[in-house]
């Protein structure tokens, strides 16, 4: 008997900007109940990959399945089950924290009592209770990041996509965010997190993919990555990362199939 579909499947994803490759032949699978890390140097293609997964970018080729559904064919069917925190967030300065999360919750069509209970819990856990009625323009960078994170999880998503979620957040706030991430997986959901904080990724993620120059250099548990990098058993994720992202680490991928386009080409 076949088990449930993986939370997320990415198949042979390609994306170019002005003819320059950003993502080349990416394939990965995220299991239910796991935290999957996406790490790589600047410009490796992590953010582009995540934007395609959440439907903000269209790939040149490839397929993305969420709970077995092709999101390119059904772009709205899956979105209620996904939470997304982009790398760069823009929040409405002249709303309060309460007003902003209320707005997000209503967009998500959350029942009023459920929304209010969830907001109270998130404000408490993220240490935003005191400033919750202050205008966002008065928030520090770390407070804004925590509020944006709260917006991404307000509806208790089954698939949470996080792009550099801990930037500018103090240690206590980082701990709270990581606890909420673990709560998602305890509920049977899945999390994909892109981060440059390798020590955090090593402790938080069940499996990881190392991206380099638009391709995946290695993927698996830390033990798997150590094997791919041919390092010792005591090697840290940083040691493995540096070895795998050396210039010769990733072979040039083959070109995507010719004359097969998901979207019409301009005349």
Where do the model's predicted regions map?
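Conserved ABC transporter NBD signature motif
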Residues: 62-73, 78, 82
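Catalytic Walker B motif of ABC-type/P-loop ATPase nucleotide-binding domains
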Residues: 160-164, 169
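Conserved ABC ATPase "signature" region
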Residues: 102, 106, 113-131
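ABC ATPase "signature
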Residues: 219-220
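Helical segment within the ABC ATPase nucleotide-binding domain
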Residues: 174-187
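Conserved catalytic motifs of ABC-family nucleotide-binding domains
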Residues: 156
